[in-house]
């Protein structure tokens, strides 16, 4: 047993290897099996009482087989011998019903992470249900105290604390069989501020990390949630115009996700990307770098290999604005005549940085002078082929580098190729949201759609 998990890594490797061995016995050309298991505790509190307290556990096995160029897959949540045999039979049968694909199949032998490094990601919290409940109650009480000290009508919303551990094992018919363990811990708080001239404002603050001790004091989340809610009271729309836009650090990863999705192998080989064929070309302002690091200790998107067994590498995705690489799994790499980059599951940890001056959040406001700070996205999206981007947003209007008033009921519109070329600064107010670490991002000109 590993942390909150009810199984251990060895048993997962055995189950994955057994599924592959049985599939090969049925005559398939190749097979791979991924087995996952995990568990944890999550606590939610509202109004000083527990709203939910859950101790959960899960396990699953997914099998993929290749036969005569055809691919079949099946999965189960039971790991007994009979269930594994049933999954093998189902995957084998499905492979006989689909069209062949010459580019499907296991990762190339030489690309597999046979004995490469696996980053440290496991850090069991050692927390009990009682200690997590106490932490959640403390977070809620501190949020309520901060709300009581704020001006106007403010109250604590739901708060939550969670701690979990996860295991994963991969086996393939090429002989690859490795496993890895990871932990994830979270805490977040919400606050609601009544606005006599409009709808109530709901804001939040959160922290997540592989290490429980790195979540920081609950007082920080409590205070930040209340301060954000109070600051957003009295929001109003503005007239449509063109102006600079500063994306707050916790929102900025949305722009990075839109960029990286255009560099996925599937988007590239199908030409369904606004960055089709972008390798080696300028795709962003020439002061920007985007770096990928799969081996960051305790990184939220770290890993020793993807679900095909291919290791990622520390590498530049963008260097001085130029595209240096795509995110490729084996199938998309073959279709492009390239080599897998170990990104069959998507990007590893990403870090956006700039060679241009940035600064604190206040310095970024001063650099913008007059424009819109975006603090929340409220609906919209982008066209992956054209790069057209539209979002309903809220935030703050700034003049002379100072916040004038909160802003609601506005939309932003632009084209992602133009937006990335018009980034003039990245702040030093860096935050990590999932796989992405970035500061605030300043775009020097965008279309703002408000009330006439």
Language-model features, listed with the residues they occupy:
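Dual-mode signal for accessory low-complexity, basic/Gly-rich regions
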Residues: 150, 222, 262, 276-452
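N-terminal cap/recognition module
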Residues: 50-95
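Acidic low-complexity segments
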Residues: 1-16, 30-42, 82, 86-178, ...
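Translation machinery proteins
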Residues: 29-57, 61
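A generic local secondary-structure boundary/capping motif
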Residues: 21-23, 50-54, 127-131, 139-150, ...
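Residue-level structural signal for beta-strand termini and adjacent loop
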Residues: 76-78, 205, 329, 409-410
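Short acidic, glycine/serine/threonine-rich loops at helix termini
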Residues: 42-47, 164-183, 199-205, 255-261, ...
